Amino acid sequence: MQKEIFIAGGCFWGVERYFQKVKGVLDTKACYINGGFEGVKYKEVCEGSSHVEAVRVIYDNSKITEEDLWKLYLRIINPYSLNKQGNDRGVQYRIGLYSYDKDLLKKFSDLNEAFMKSEGKKNYIEIQKVEDVTLAEEYHQNYLLKNVNGYCHINLDDIPEEYQKQ
């Protein structure tokens, strides 16, 4: 069954490219979400609109589970860093998982609660309902496919073999 999740892990270029390489992921789009209004532009996001850079991930949950997506997500973020991932700083780089689906939010919330319990401390991962979505400008879509030497704070090769697309 196809499902949709919005994944925020800092700059969306690396998040998008990372999940494009994961089996079961069918489509990705760089977006700005949950800033209170639609139609935002990159310049406004950089100037503090409160939107978060996120990647809409469409996946087949018969090929990759939510638990697997969670494990992979934890490989690419620092869950204890507020509004900063890699060299990127600002509220647009906060981390979280967002959805329209209440059951999906509950599942990820439970996974995060178990993670915090196992770590013995709180983290900054938001698990929230999607309120508003604006597709990022075309030059942001597939950025690291078009700019193979472009900036990325994520190790794009850090995908365990069992999760890699063939």
UniProtKB/Swiss-Prot annotation:
The keyword Oxidoreductase applies. One of its GO terms (biological process) is cellular response to oxidative stress. GO terms for cellular component: cytoplasm. The keyword Cell inner membrane does not apply. InterPro entries: Met_Sox_Rdtase_MsrA_dom, Met_Sox_Rdtase_MsrA_sf, MsrA_MetSO_reductase. GO terms for molecular function: L-methionine-(S)-S-oxide reductase activity; peptide-methionine (S)-S-oxide reductase activity. Pfam families: PMSR. The active site is at C11. Its EC number is 1.8.4.11. Keywords: Oxidoreductase. It catalyses: L-methionyl-[protein] + [thioredoxin]-disulfide + H2O = L-methionyl-(S)-S-oxide-[protein] + [thioredoxin]-dithiol; [thioredoxin]-disulfide + L-methionine + H2O = L-methionine (S)-S-oxide + [thioredoxin]-dithiol. Has an important function as a repair enzyme for proteins that have been inactivated by oxidation. Catalyzes the reversible oxidation-reduction of methionine sulfoxide in proteins to methionine. Belongs to the MsrA Met sulfoxide reductase family. This is Peptide methionine sulfoxide reductase MsrA. It comes from Mycoplasmopsis pulmonis (strain UAB CTIP).
